[in-house]
Amino acid sequence: MSKFLSQAAINTLRNTRLGSRQLVRSFAGISNTRNHRGAGHQEWGCGQSAERGLLELRMPVACRRSMFIQTQDTPNPESLKFLPGVDVLGKGNTYDFPHGTTAHSSPLAKLLFRVEGVKGVFFGADFITISKQEGAEWSLIKPEVFAVIMDFFASGLPVLNDAQPNADTEILEDDDETVMMIKELLDTRIRPTVQEDGGDIVFMGYEAGVVKLKMQGSCSSCPSSIVTLKNGVQNMLQFYIPEVESVEQVFDEADRMIDSEFERFEKNLKTLKQQGPSGGGPH
């Protein structure tokens, strides 16, 4: 019976056109009531992105058109969302490049990683999220990112070569009913809200009542990512799918190893800079 109600509720969600934050407030309040935690509501999502900047950049004369690139703050101070005014991957599609070593499948990502201070690149439907290294200044990074984006879209090259965007919520033949409902809810209501803040949530698996998710883009290192998962995503999934007991964030072991190597490299580089030209070389 619970599964029938869950599917019916999801069908209702499909046909309901509520603002994402309004929907979140409703579900957070319902979840609190259901769990007998008292009145009130909790907001979820990576946060609210309010500030926008607009810069007009002129294309080369041969292109005979202008590109307007907007920037949008994210809840993560280390990440910034760039909106070029054209499709990047198209509706609902995302692709994450957490490190420069993962950019081999995208000419655009390769160019963006050449900008000093860029740590991560994330592509969405119509936006690009840039995550910077700690201590790097946006005032120095932004002009170079603007130039790279402008030149790239003027070139007509494909954003991705052979790689395919995320397809983690695609319904598979061997998915049971619970997994299908989890994917449906993630795809229709949760991911669009997170993507508004320059990130994404990827379904990694479901086992013994535990939903495993991976945060990407601005959400991967966002201080509020755990709050997003527990107070937002978990509450919503539990309300519509009683079989869900908890939500856990997972990390790729390869990403951890690359992070460790990158931090070691940065530390060595800072040491060399502090030593200066006279530090150890022949005079």
Curated annotation (Swiss-Prot):
Renumbered residue ranges of the record's region NifU: 182-250
Subcellular location: Mitochondrion
InterPro entries xref list: FSCA_dom_sf (IPR034904), Nfu/NifU_N (IPR014824), Nfu/NifU_N_sf (IPR036498), NIF_FeS_clus_asmbl_NifU_C (IPR001075), RNA-helicase_DEAD-box_CS (IPR000629)
Record-level GO BP terms: iron-sulfur cluster assembly
Species this protein is from: Drosophila simulans
Main location as per UniProt: mitochondrion
Lineage of the species this protein comes from: Eukaryota, Metazoa, Ecdysozoa, Arthropoda, Hexapoda
Family membership noted in the UniProt record: Belongs to the NifU family.
Pfam families: Nfu_N (PF08712), NifU (PF01106)
Function, in words: Molecular scaffold for [Fe-S] cluster assembly of mitochondrial iron-sulfur proteins.
Domain of life of the source: Eukaryota
UniProt: [4Fe-4S] cluster binding residues: C219, C222
A GO CC term attached to the entry: mitochondrion
Keywords: Iron, Iron-sulfur, Metal-binding, Mitochondrion, Transit peptide
Transit peptide (residue range): 1-65
GO molecular function term, any single one: iron-sulfur cluster binding
The protein, known as: NFU1 iron-sulfur cluster scaffold homolog, mitochondrial
